Amino acid sequence: ASGGVGLRRAARAVQCGDAEIVACIAGDTNHVGSFRNTIASFSQFANDAVYPYGSGGPNGSFAFLTDHYMREFGARREDFAKLCIAQRDNALAFPHALMKRPLTLDAYMDARPIADPLCLFDCVMPCAGAEAYLVMAEDRAKSLNLDYARILSTIERHNAYPDDPIQIRGGWAMDVDGFYDLAGIGPEDIDFLQVYDDYPVICFMQIEDLGFCKKGEAAEFVRTHDLTVAGGDFPINTSGGQLSVGQAGAAGGSLGLVETIRQLTDANLGAVVQGARHGLAS
């Protein structure tokens, strides 16, 4: 589901001269049968320790992670709610979002439980969808009179921190310093953030691991920042993210990346981050 991996491969192909223009296309759908196959083989952990005992799918696993994060760092459901409500606010201006109505704190807090402490609005809505973009050299884009966004830096990490008994940090934390050094900017220069949002707790982890605050401080960070595009000092998931737009299977990882390109090339479909120069997508 990683849009960034495809971007890195395409950029390398262009840099090496193996291709002049690469079309990166992601499309997927969710059917009941295919979803059951997915949860049956979601990860090696799921294969060995979860699915055989009747707790299939990621909801249960991420519920454990969310519960641990809340107890370890003092995060509250109201903190996760603020993120979800802000993303829904952003989604109201995005024509392709599945969720068309505002989300209130009461509606979030009173939503039916899915896997404690996760409730309905902590989970993505499966859907069908697709995203696409072109990768080429800057001079080629100019010759074709195309608006473009420049890639300043990318990182890719798999199976990070395999010895952690509970994953409260991701691969971003291993490479974040080199990531910003290569880009020549820092977290303070980022105008908006698009994070992979399969669950709110993963957004919190990325806010921390990408250098916007220290580990365990994302809840306080969210409490003290406006995450909406309309009035926010820290716009996050400007299209609404997967929690409000929907998760088109493996194509979901390209949602934030394409939205980043739109924001930086004045090709917005929804809310506009005024004057944005630097965006970060995970």
For each predicted feature, which ranges?
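Stable alpha-helical structural segments in soluble proteins, enriched in small hydrophobic residues
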Residues: S2, G6, A10, V14, ...
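Active-site-proximal alpha-helical scaffold in enzymes
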Residues: A1-D28, N59-A93, Y133-D139, A248-N268
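Beta-strand segments within the central parallel beta-sheet cores of soluble alpha/beta enzyme folds
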Residues: V22-G27, E78-I85, L146-E156, P187-Y196, ...
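Phosphate/pyrophosphate-binding loops at sites that engage ATP/ADP/AMP, CoA/4′-phosphopantetheine
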Residues: Y69-G74, V176-D189, N268
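Condensing-enzyme catalytic core mediating Claisen C-C bond formation in acyl metabolism
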Residues: D48, A81-K82, P113-G178, L227-S239, ...
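Short glycine/threonine-rich loop-to-helix capping motif typified by GTGT followed
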Residues: D163-Q167, D197-F221, G232, A248-A250
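Conserved catalytic cysteine-centered active-site region
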Residues: A1-I25, T29-S61, M99-M125, L152-R157, ...
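Short acidic, glycine/serine/threonine-rich loops at helix termini
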Residues: G33-T38, L92-H96, D163, F204-I207, ...
